[in-house]
């Protein structure tokens, strides 16, 4: 199970980097748009938290109702949440999600230099 979890995480990290190659598939754009709507630091933080909540925990019992498959969101939200689900106390997931939503986010994903080559390599790797 641990090996399968690591393979899944590795694949998702590659997908995160691949999606970073296009601005429409980046959490960074969503967060910047939200923050730029505020005029004070408090407003900017609140708008960022609301924007992140919309694409993560919003929807109540309909888990991941408004989910997005964006670079940054995969690496910094979905992967840690998956790891928490499989390796730690599942009861702490909601608490962790709320902490992620209310904490300022910054991009730490570096896109591939050649996304086409990376995509082909990723296809080859997953077909093994």
Task: Annotate each language-model stretch with its function.
Residues 1-128:
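Catalytic domains of carbohydrate-active enzymes that cleave complex glycans
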């Amino acid at each position: 199970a641990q090996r399968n979890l690591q393979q899944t995480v590795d694949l998702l990290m590659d997908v995160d980097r691949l999606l970073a190659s296009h601005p429409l598939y980046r959490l960074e754009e969503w967060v910047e748009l939200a923050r730029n709507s505020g005029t004070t630091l408090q407003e900017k933080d609140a708008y960022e938290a609301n924007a992140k909540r919309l694409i993560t925990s919003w929807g109540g019992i309909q888990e991941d109702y408004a989910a997005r498959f964006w670079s940054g969101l995969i690496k910094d939200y979905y992967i840690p949440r998956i790891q928490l689900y499989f390796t730690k106390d599942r009861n702490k997931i909601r608490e962790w999600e709320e902490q992620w939503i209310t904490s300022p986010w910054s991009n730490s994903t570096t896109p591939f230099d050649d996304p086409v080559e990376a995509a082909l390599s990723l296809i080859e790797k997953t077909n093994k």
